[in-house]
Amino acid sequence: MATKIVIDAGHNGLSDPGAVYNGRRESDDTLRLAMAVGEILSRSGYDVDYTRTGNINQSVIQKAQLANDTDADLFISIHRNMSEVPGSYHGVQSLVYDLNGPKLTMAEAINKNLEGVGFRNINVEARPNLAVLRRTKMPAILVEVGFIDNAEDNKLFDTRLDEIAQAIADGIMDTLTSIENEASDGQPAAEKPVDRPLYRVQVGAFYNLQNAIDLEQELKRMGYNTWIVTA
């Protein structure tokens, strides 16, 4: 089995902890789950790499580049969601660059499996603006595994982590097996990488570092991937 899969634990645990609610950090949850998913895939014979196995200063651009440099066949990014009003939303959602190809089938399978664990299945949505989906050359999926500000989602995450990891891994493996079977029957299945233009948007420029940090944190709360650079 030659399939190489890169598993990304969302955010980095240092400069970017992701969503934080009542002391609970998204970056800690994503690392636990990413390692569990990767372990299942490795035991099943897949070649697995990780963007991180601990807390490191790493940007989303570096995550995507790591996957590209390893010539991965698939990129799975594990995240958790957060609502503007704590506790107002719950469920799982998967994000893809566009709603085409095997990645859509895989995202739908992952969502359905997680629904079987107990999460509400929100949907699969196209998010071409996300760097880890836009800059990766291989099919990529970002899975939002419940809301970090929802008590029921957190209870599922904490008490059924192994089942959640198995549900994600099964969605990946079942789809890959289906693709392999279709390919052996002479049916086109694989998604070809496409070159995508990269656009950058600058929101603000400041002489005061704290002002830049404040704006960056506000944008992250709105769901944007941001980083601070010096001119």
Stretches with model-predicted labels:
Residues 1-2, 231:
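Short, solvent-exposed mixed-charge patches
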Residues 19, 56, 201:
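Generic anion/oxyanion-binding catalytic loop in active/binding sites
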Residues 183-231:
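Solvent-exposed beta-strand motifs enriched in subsets of small alpha/beta binding domains
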Residues 10:
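Extracellular repeat turn/loop positions enriched in glycine and acidic/polar residues, especially those
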Residues 2-4, 14-16, 24-191:
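Active-site-proximal helix/loop segments of hydrolytic enzymes
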